[in-house]
Structure formats: structure tokens, C-alpha cells
Regions:
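Cross-family detector of peptidyl-prolyl cis-trans isomerase
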Residues: 2-165
């Protein structure tokens, strides 16, 4: 298929330019925006109390789903390029993007990704899989984008496969 790269390339572009810039000009319903914000805050409060969930900077939380096989496995820096498998979903379980579904991991320069990933991924060891809980202000904020409503908390499953300096 000559255009098999199209969807991964578009996803990479969206992540590179940042989630917050992807929804220019969309004006969601103010009541829905407020309800989403409230639901997201309640979700993060609930998740923060679950076993194994740890706090990160800026109101994010994470849970190690698969630890690194090597306790001394390297961690990337923001200047590195990372190879990851990931799935992004809403708090209701709706998947909005998945390299797992495409069957092909993504390779990104970390410094070009959204802030949530620039903060979280350097904390991961090569070989780990995390579930990352991202407050709306580190995602799309108060703007909707495609299937993602405004003020949505995002949940990412991220597997750090490789690090390239």
C-alpha cells in the first residue's frame, strides 16, 4: 500500500506540534466544557488514590505497568529520540490514537513532543510501560480537537522501546 505511512506521519505531526495547538478555532459548548473539566478533575482525584499510582510534575500521575528488565536501564533525556508504542484514550475508554493498533511503534525527537511527554518520558527506563494520566491543561486544554472534547483528561499507555541520542 503506497500510503501506509500517512496515518503514522499525521499522528507524529500532531504530537510534534503539541496537543494544544491542534484545535485552532473550535468553540465548544461552555456547559460541556465545564462538565468535562469537573469530570476530569474527579477522575484524576480517584486515580491518584489507586495502588501503584505515583505523582509527577504539573498534576500528572503515572503507574508502571511493566518495569524494566534491567534495574539500571537508561532513561532518555529531552534531547534524545525515542521509539515508543503508545495508546491515547479519554477517561471513558475511547481510544483516539494507538500505535499498537497500527502495529508499528513511533519514533519521535522527545524535545518536539507535547509537554506531558517531555516531562514523563525522561522519567521512564528503557523497557518500561507506563500508564500516564494527563490533566487537560497539558493536553488540548479548553479546545476540542477531532474526537477529543475540550478540557479532556488524557490517558496514555506508553512503552519505551528504545532511546537514540
Amino acid at each position: 500500500m503506497p500510503f501506509a505511512w500517512t496515518k503514522p506521519a499525521l499522528v507524529a505531526t500532531a504530537l510534534m506540534f503539541g496537543l494544544s495547538g491542534a484545535a485552532c478555532g473550535q468553540k465548544p459548548d461552555p456547559a460541556a466544557v465545564a462538565a468535562n473539566l469537573e469530570a476530569g478533575q474527579a477522575y484524576l482525584t480517584k486515580v491518584s488514590k489507586e495502588d501503584g499510582v505515583q505523582p509527577l510534575e504539573r498534576g500528572m500521575y503515572y503507574k508502571v505497568l511493566t518495569p524494566a528488565a534491567d534495574a539500571n536501564a537508561p532513561k532518555p533525556t529531552v534531547r534524545d529520540t525515542v521509539k515508543v508504542h503508545y495508546e491515547g484514550k479519554l477517561i471513558d475508554g475511547t481510544v483516539f490514537d494507538s500505535s499498537f493498533e497500527r502495529g508499528s511503534p513511533a519514533v519521535f525527537p522527545l524535545e518536539g513532543l507535547v509537554e506531558a511527554w517531555r516531562v514523563a518520558i525522561p522519567q521512564m527506563k528503557k523497557g518500561e510501560t507506563w500508564e500516564l494520566y494527563v490533566p487537560s491543561e497539558l493536553g488540548y486544554g479548553d479546545k476540542a480537537a477531532g474526537p477529543i472534547p475540550a478540557n479532556s483528561v488524557l490517558v496514555f499507555k506508553i512503552e519505551l522501546i528504545d532511546i537514540q541520542p
